Structures are given as structure tokens and as C-alpha cells.
């Protein structure tokens, strides 16, 4: 299957390019109160080290807005302010923030949106039209209900509103809490405009449910060439949002980065403590940003075949096993020594690639 990404306009959020030929960026949103400057910066730094590209923050009132100005001055990542109901907060924040997300369903009148556009245009920052199936404008929900038809009408109405005011630094999201409807919404909007898309499933739930829903919806869209930036929404799991998003990009084959771990599900042939080994390997390799395929297999049935396609591999046997690199056996050791040697080979593989670059 040939991957061909839909060519969109390119915009800029801080120092991050979105759309065009730019890599697909990964976003998250803080769950602190924005007025908690120290707590917000702590979460931003966690996301930075987890591999996030952009962070969004809620802004409920002027206390949040003033705090956001100080947070922005100290943040290692571009910041987007998330505005609902009070358009004046977007106008105030525009001069020091990297982007604004508005919800057309609750930002208020056309005049309110015009004021936000004027501020963003003067400050040269983009706007995300964040259409959400749970908060569609009344004029569209009355006619179409709260389904995909209403979302499309809302998106196109607001795109035209911004364009009529000569504003084109736009990205769009079409979020629902249902994977199938999310796919439909983005697919139907894609031929109608060339603005970059922010992908996501809203209110996706806790780690398990969010991972399943997001993998289905975002993976499906990415494989069809749709999507320029993305967030895996997950209740209370900052680093996991980034980890799952990067895994979706990696395992869909759309954007390679980090470690791809191949490991067997275990069966009655296992004669080693594979579960402990894989947990150690996962923990010790999660910091790696280089695209790397590693294999941890519990017996010889598939181990050697998988090892041929892996950069570094372990093939466990009874009380012993093999460490394999690029299909060649580099060590035969007793079980207690295998994981340490394997991890050493992984680190050496990463270093060798850095040197080549």
C-alpha cells in the first residue's frame, strides 16, 4: 500500500511548521489550572521530554490569561490558548501566544469572531477552528442535529468567515467521541479545503479506551494521507498521550521515530522469564528517538525469522539464548546475561547511527 499524504497549506505555530511537507506534529493539553504557573510549567516540561511538539492550555478568565503570559516566557514548547465563551481572552492573549483555538459553537456572534481574527492577524498567529460534535452552533444543530452533517456545515461556514476577512492561517479539527464518526467527518471535509487538519478523538476516555479509539480513528485517517498534527486525548495521562501518538505514527508506517518492539505473546513453548525481560527492555529503551526495530522472542520457532528484520534481537531458549544484530548472532549467553548484553547492543546501534549522521 503506497502512502500518499494530502498536500495542505503550511502554517506555523511558534517554531513548528504544520502542513505541507512538514512532519506530523504531536500535541497535548495541560490539565492544570493555567493560573498555577509552577504546576503548568512542570507539566509542559514533562511533555517536552516525552516528545511533544506543541501544548494547549485552557483559559477561563483573566487570571489564567495573565498567568499564560508568564508561562509562555518560560515554556520550551509553542503554546496554544484554548478559548470557549469569552472571545476577549483570545484577543488579550494573541500578542504573546503562538496560536488560538476557538470553538465555533460557543465563541458567540460573528462580531466576536471578527475581533479574534483581527487580533490574530495583527500578531501573525494561526487560528484552529475546533468543531466539536457536542457543541455545534444552534443554527446547524437545529437543522442537522449533532451529527457529521452539522459539523461540516459549521466548519465550512467558519472557514468562509475567516477567508472573507482575508485570514488564511487556519487549521481545522472535526472531533467526536466516536471513532467511526470522527473518520467520516475528516474524510468528508478533506476534499472541500486545503487547510491542515488537527486529528483527534475528543473525550476518548482513560488509557485503554483512548488508545483503542485513537488508534482506529487516527491510524485510519493517517493511512489515507489525512492529518498534519494530532492529539491522543487521554484522561489524566500526559506522557502516555505522546507515547501512544508516536506509536500510531510509527506503526502505521507514516512517520518512523523511536523504538518498535516486536515480542511474542508467549505460549507453552516458553522456557524463560520473557515477561520480565520485555518490561525491562520497554523501560530502558523508551528514551530512544531514533527509528529502531528490536525483537524479543521467547523461543526459536519465530525468533530467527523476526531477528532478520530487526536491528537488534534476543532469541530466548532454555536457560540461555542468543543476541542477534542485523541477522548475525553476536553472543550466546546464559539467560541472566542476555538482557544486559541486548541493551548494550541497542545503545551501540543508536550511537553508530548518530555518528553516521
Swiss-Prot record:
Reactions it catalyzes: (2E)-4-hydroxy-3-methylbut-2-enyl diphosphate + oxidized [flavodoxin] + H2O + 2 H(+) = 2-C-methyl-D-erythritol 2,4-cyclic diphosphate + reduced [flavodoxin]
GO MF annotation, one: 4-hydroxy-3-methylbut-2-enyl-diphosphate synthase activity (flavodoxin)
Pfam assignment, any one: GcpE
Transmembrane segments: none
Disulfide bond positions: none
Enzyme category, top tier: oxidoreductase
Entry keyword annotation includes Electron transport: no
Record's keyword terms, sorted: 4Fe-4S, Iron, Iron-sulfur, Isoprene biosynthesis, Metal-binding, Oxidoreductase
Entry cofactors: [4Fe-4S] cluster
Record SUPFAM superfamilies: Dihydropteroate synthetase-like, Nitrite and sulphite reductase 4Fe-4S domain-like
Binding site for [4Fe-4S] cluster: 264, 267, 299, 306
GO biological process: isopentenyl diphosphate biosynthetic process, methylerythritol 4-phosphate pathway; terpenoid biosynthetic process
UniProt keyword Transcription present: no
Pathway: Isoprenoid biosynthesis; isopentenyl diphosphate biosynthesis via DXP pathway; isopentenyl diphosphate from 1-deoxy-D-xylulose 5-phosphate: step 5/6
InterPro entries: Dihydropteroate_synth-like_sf (IPR011005), IspG_bac (IPR016425), IspG_bac-typ (IPR004588), NO2/SO3_Rdtase_4Fe4S_sf (IPR045854)
Cofactor comment text: Binds 1 [4Fe-4S] cluster.
Listed EC numbers: 1.17.7.3
PANTHER family referenced in this protein's UniProt entry, alphabetically: 4-HYDROXY-3-METHYLBUT-2-EN-1-YL DIPHOSPHATE SYNTHASE, 4-HYDROXY-3-METHYLBUT-2-EN-1-YL DIPHOSPHATE SYNTHASE (FERREDOXIN), CHLOROPLASTIC
Family designation: Belongs to the IspG family.
The protein's role, per its UniProt record: Converts 2C-methyl-D-erythritol 2,4-cyclodiphosphate (ME-2,4cPP) into 1-hydroxy-2-methyl-2-(E)-butenyl 4-diphosphate.
Protein name as annotated: 4-hydroxy-3-methylbut-2-en-1-yl diphosphate synthase (flavodoxin)
Organism in which the protein naturally occurs: Campylobacter jejuni subsp. doylei (strain ATCC BAA-1458 / RM4099 / 269.97)
Lineage summary: Bacteria, Pseudomonadati, Campylobacterota, Epsilonproteobacteria, Campylobacterales
Gene that specifies this protein: ispG
